[in-house]
């Protein structure tokens, strides 16, 4: 069963300013919570197009969204191919570019992927090292820890995991694999612990948290996919349409913040103006200058939402 608590549900969907007859895209279907809220507000010619790489998520959506399937299109794809896939979904185009009214991203791994041991995402379960969101993908966490050079392992732990003990952990990994391959998440989690000083292991949550995050990002090229997809989202949103983006760690948020800023910096209109009138060439308006974060009530229900941030931008 695909059990998942949707993060910032109302805030992210309300940020899209849904029009009943509009065309909306959920780039990260997951448990279908955001999709259900979007599609329940559509009528007439309104449509929802939802992307996911995970067959379990798509199967779950067919059940959860069954009452609305006459206006839902499910697409198995990485969202980095947003423009290409929308062209296959019979949406209006302008100069060959598909145009929709709203696009939502809920980045990060869904709870079922974290909780199902066999997916190999979690340091809390002993399972084969995998971490692929798309089970058809070629690269796995096993490949990285058992075949990449020490300096490359250290680099991804430092850059993607912001792990201060990246060099020490990478050294422990390489030393261990000289004796036998590192095959499970449990083995890897124990190795990571040995690369972190005892004093540092007492604070900041599970000592393997940052390393597992780094490997997951590397396996799925998450940051590259995010950047590609946001660029395409800006192209595919029609004027007045909005992009809602939920991020879960500083690297994701930085990419979103900087990309949005690159499209608004040339516009000098006040933030409450509905459209650009200054003659600048900005393409976006920030709907919220500062990111929206979960309420205390949401945190009580879903502690995993603590690091979530929502940014919303509107096409000018």
From Swiss-Prot:
GO terms for molecular function: rRNA (cytosine-N4-)-methyltransferase activity. One of its GO terms (cellular component) is cytoplasm. NCBIfam families: 16S rRNA (cytosine(1402)-N(4))-methyltransferase RsmH. The lineage of its organism: Bacteria, Bacillati, Bacillota, Bacilli, Bacillales. It comes from Paenibacillus sp. (strain JDR-2). S-adenosyl-L-methionine binds at residues 32-34, 52, 79, 106, 113. It comes from the Bacteria. Its EC number is 2.1.1.199. Disulfide bonds: none annotated. Belongs to the methyltransferase superfamily. RsmH family. This is Ribosomal RNA small subunit methyltransferase H. Pfam families: Methyltransf_5 (PF01795). InterPro entries: RsmH, SAM-dep_MeTrfase_MraW_recog, SAM-dependent_MTases_sf.
């Amino acid at each position: 069963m695909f059990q998942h608590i949707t993060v910032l549900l109302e805030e992210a969907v309300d940020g899209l300013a849904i029009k009943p007859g509009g065309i909306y895209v959920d780039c990260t279907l997951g448990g279908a919570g955001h999709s259900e809220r979007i599609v329940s507000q559509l009528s007439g010619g309104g449509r929802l197009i939802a992307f996911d790489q995970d067959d379990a998520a798509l199967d779950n959506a067919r059940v959860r969204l069954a009452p609305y399937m006459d206006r839902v299109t499910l697409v198995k794809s990485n969202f980095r191919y947003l423009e290409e896939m929308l062209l296959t979904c019979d949406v209006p185009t302008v100069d060959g570019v598909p145009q929709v009214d709203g696009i939502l991203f809920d980045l990060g791994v869904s709870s079922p992927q974290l909780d199902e041991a066999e997916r190999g995402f979690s340091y809390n379960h002993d399972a084969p090292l995998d971490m692929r969101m798309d089970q058809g993908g070629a690269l796995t966490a096993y490949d990285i820890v058992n075949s990449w050079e020490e300096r490359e392992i250290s680099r991804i732990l430092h850059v993607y995991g912001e792990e201060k003990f990246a060099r020490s952990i990478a050294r422990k990994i390489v030393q261990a694999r000289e004796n036998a391959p590192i095959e499970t998440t449990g083995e890897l989690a124990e190795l990571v612990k040995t690369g972190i000083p005892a004093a540092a292991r007492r604070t900041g949550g599970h000592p393997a948290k940052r390393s597992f995050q780094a490997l997951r990002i590397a396996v799925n090229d998450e940051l590259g996919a995010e950047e590609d997809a946001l660029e395409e989202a800006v192209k595919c949103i029609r004027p007045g349409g909005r992009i809602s983006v939920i991020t879960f760690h500083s690297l994701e948020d930085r990419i979103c913040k900087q990309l949005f800023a690159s499209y608004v910096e040339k516009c000098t209109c006040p933030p409450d103006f509905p459209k650009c009138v200054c003659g600048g060439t900005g393409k976006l308006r920030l709907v919220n200058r500062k990111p929206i974060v979960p309420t205390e009530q949401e945190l009580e229900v879903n502690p995993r939402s603590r690091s979530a941030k929502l940014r919303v931008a509107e096409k000018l």
